[in-house]
């Protein structure tokens, strides 16, 4: 696969992360000898080196000679890798994996892997030594989708924040000046009711102002807004059109929550799980609906590895659609007559023998690589977006089972 000078797309970076994580997850150590270190972006590399040095010293107390040697070798390898970094890690931090993994027949191989700049910032430093690498936090980052606005309010207070992946981030809060329902002596009931309504209206405007300040600048990136609180507060707030008009269209739903402090934001996320799951699949569903429309009535659809690849080379693919669950390699064959052919196989299988379909001669394997990498490399060169499609809905499952996991929506018809 040719090297790309341009910065890889976000989808491509996530896919590369996913591949490495799946490989690391399969490794096993014969004892607690596989070391994982999560390093947040604000952690000085010198502090990490000092911690690794301390762990190396403490590892000398491990009773098993083999485990002791393997742990210390892993820590030495990590220190060697850390020398390549300046004062701080790259953006979003980094994760270092190192250890002697079982390779069968009683043998071990030393593996060291560094994953830089994960999809979300690493929040805290973590040192982990076990019989398996700690990959779950990274896997959760890759599974996280979307940016959502959160608003919780009652007539006493309000909190506004973000849901970024699975991370709830409180940002703004306000307390109301709405008086209780009991009026003070000397006030007429009518005047008290009017003043109370004015205070409620002012508070709703203040909440909307917080939300507008936070969400409007991100209105083209935000995937939805959840609003929570008791009835009728949240209903009055939404029905009163207090939110900016471009944000009103982003509201996914309103939900009953008991608390409106910062903890209420997490309660709101829990209450809105169904709406969030549906929103996460919205883009995938839209892509697949368009694909099926073009497949059934238009001419701007292609599917299957070979047809999709040929359209990519012609530059005719607007969006490359790939199943998230696809795990295949592509084997490239050449025959004595210089015909080149491609065959996709399960990445766990050995390459099969191949006969050239053009001339019938026996073909020789000349290369083998990850099939998705192969297509994305062409897509990057042609300005084609790559969208990974979930199998958590019917048409997404059909992409994998009925169309081989590869499809494309075309810019123009090619007849291929």
UniProtKB/Swiss-Prot annotation:
Subcellular location, principal: cytoplasm
SUPFAM superfamilies named in the record: L30e-like, N-terminal domain of eukaryotic peptide chain release factor subunit 1, ERF1, Translational machinery components
Signal peptide residues on this chain, from the entry's feature table: none
Gene3D superfamilies, sorted: 1.20.5.170, 3.30.1330.30, eRF1 domain 1, eRF1 domain 2
Location(s) in or outside the cell: Cytoplasm
Keyword Protein biosynthesis: yes
GO molecular function: translation release factor activity, codon specific
Cellular component GO terms held in the UniProt record: cytoplasm
Keywords: Cytoplasm, Protein biosynthesis
Record-stated family: Belongs to the eukaryotic release factor 1 family.
Subunit annotation: Heterodimer of two subunits, one of which binds GTP.
Functional description taken from the UniProt entry: Directs the termination of nascent peptide synthesis (translation) in response to the termination codons UAA, UAG and UGA.
Name of the featured protein: Peptide chain release factor subunit 1
Record organism: Halobacterium salinarum (strain ATCC 29341 / DSM 671 / R1)
């Amino acid at each position: 696969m040719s090297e790309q000078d341009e910065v890889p797309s976000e989808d491509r970076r996530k896919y590369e992360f996913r591949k490495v994580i799946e490989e690391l997850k399969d490794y096993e150590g014969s004892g607690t000898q596989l070391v994982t270190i999560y390093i947040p972006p604000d952690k000085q590399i010198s502090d990490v080196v000092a911690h690794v040095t301390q762990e190396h010293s403490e590892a000398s107390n491990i009773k098993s000679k083999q485990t002791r040697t393997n742990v210390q070798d892993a820590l030495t390898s990590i220190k060697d890798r850390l020398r390549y970094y300046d004062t701080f890690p790259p953006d979003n931090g980094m994760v270092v994996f190192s250890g002697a993994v079982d390779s069968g027949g009683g043998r071990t191989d030393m593996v060291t892997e560094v994953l830089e700049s994960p999809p979300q910032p690493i929040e805290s430093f973590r040192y982990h030594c076990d019989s398996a690498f700690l990959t779950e936090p990274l896997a959760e980052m890759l599974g996280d989708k979307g940016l959502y606005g959160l608003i919780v309010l009652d007539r006493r207070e309000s909190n506004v924040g973000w849901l970024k992946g699975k991370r709830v981030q409180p940002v703004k809060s306000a307390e109301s000046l709405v008086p209780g329902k009991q009026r003070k002596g000397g006030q007429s009931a009518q005047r008290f009711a009017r003043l109370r309504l004015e205070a409620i209206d002012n508070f709703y405007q203040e909440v909307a102002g917080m939300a507008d300040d936070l969400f409007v600048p991100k209105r083209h990136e935000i995937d939805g807004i959840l609003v929570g609180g008791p009835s009728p507060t949240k209903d009055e707030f939404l029905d009163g059109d207090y939110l900016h008009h471009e944000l009103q269209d982003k509201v996914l739903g309103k939900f009953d929550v008991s608390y409106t402090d910062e903890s209420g934001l997490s309660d709101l996320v829990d209450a809105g799980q169904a709406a969030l799951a549906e929103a996460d699949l919205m883009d995938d569903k839209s892509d697949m609906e368009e694909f099926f429309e073009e497949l059934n009535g238009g001419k701007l659809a292609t599917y299957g590895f070979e047809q999709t690849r040929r359209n990519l080379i012609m530059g005719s693919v607007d969006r490359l659609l790939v199943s998230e669950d696809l795990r295949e390699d592509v084997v490239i064959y050449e025959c004595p007559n210089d015909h080149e052919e491609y065959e996709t196989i399960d990445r766990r299988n050995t390459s099969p023998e191949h006969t050239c379909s053009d001339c019938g001669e026996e073909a020789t394997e000349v290369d083998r690589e990850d099939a998705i990498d192969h297509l994305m490399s062409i897509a990057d060169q042609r300005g084609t977006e790559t969208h990974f499609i979930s199998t958590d809905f019917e048409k997404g499952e059909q992409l994998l089972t009925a169309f081989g996991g590869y499809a494309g929506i075309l810019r123009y018809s090619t007849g291929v």
